[in-house]
Design a protein with these regions (language model features):
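Short glycine-enriched, charge-decorated loop/helix-capping segments at active-site entrances
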Residues: 51-57, 124-128, 219-220
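Predominantly flavin-linked oxidoreductase catalytic cores and closely associated redox partners
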Residues: 130, 134-227, 231, 235-237
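Beta1-alpha1 glycine-rich phosphate/pyrophosphate-binding loop at the start
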Residues: 2-79, 86, 165, 172-215
Length: 248
């Protein structure tokens, strides 16, 4: 396979990553004398702030995934290739991809971030992250599987485990996820699973610091805390998760 990129009289800017940074740069270069080549493993941009809605069933994936080619369809100097970048050869000014080497005059690495497990391999292996549509769908499936399995057991301890949810991190995503789970508990799941007692469902939000939304003003932190507590979320401050076996 080859990238089959057209030649251009303009310098080539290769942008690795179709996230917020990559698409913002590509938009700014729309009418500039550059050939813009965007590379990404997926052919869509994910609006990550709403992944929690996909994970909890509030939105379908196509509501937050936008085709990159369509986004730049009117930009003649833009070219997209779906590929994985394995390494960069700075001497030859090439990125080595699954489509072969792609030369560049300017290279921008906008690959985004990954879930920070703080070096804890056990948690990394057993916990669920939420940085992509597939991960959000995995979470949705796991949530629903838990309630299906709750139907199938008479073991009280097992039932308690299946109906307990722990969200780690009191930043925007953690707060939104905990709130969405609480809304599910109150308004959605009792209708879908009328045989289950949702008073047994517990939602915990664990935050290593002394308040939620630490990057925001304190008023926002207090408002978020009050809203979650009103929804029945148990918030644990100044605590860190040190072990997770996949069950406890």
């Amino acid at each position: 396979m080859k990238a089959n990129l057209p030649t251009s009289e303009y310098p080539r800017v290769v942008v690795v990553g179709g996230g917020f940074g990559g698409i913002t740069l590509a938009e700014k270069l729309a009418k500039q004398p550059f050939q813009v080549v965007m590379l990404d493993r997926h052919n869509y941009h994910t609006f990550q702030p709403l992944l929690y809605q996909v994970a909890t069933g509030g939105l379908e994936p196509d509501s937050i995934a936008f085709p990159l080619r369509k986004m730049f369809g009117n930009q003649k100097n833009f070219h997209f290739r779906m590929t994985r970048v394995d390494r960069v050869d700075t001497d030859k000014q090439e990125v080595i991809t699954t489509l072969g080497p792609i030369s560049y005059d300017y290279l921008v690495l906008a690959t985004g971030s990954s879930t920070n497990f703080f070096g804890n391999k056990e948690i990394e292996e057993n916990a669920n992250g939420m940085k992509s549509v597939p991960e959000a769908l995995d979470l949705r499936s796991l949530i629903l599987q838990n309630f299906e399995q709750t139907h199938e057991t008479d073991n009280i301890s097992e039932r308690d485990l299946l109906m307990d949810f722990v969200v780690v991190g009191g930043g925007p995503t953690g707060v939104e996820m905990a709130g969405a789970l609480a809304e599910l508990k109150l308004h959605v799941l009792p209708h879908d699973y009328p045989e289950l007692d949702f008073n047994l469902m517990n939602i915990h939000l664990v935050e290593g610091g002394s308040r939620l939304l630490a990057g925001m003003v304190e008023r926002s932190s207090l408002d978020a805390q009050k809203a979650l507590e009103k929804l029945g979320v148990d918030i644990h401050f100044n605590e860190r998760v040190t072990e997770f076996s996949g069950r406890e």
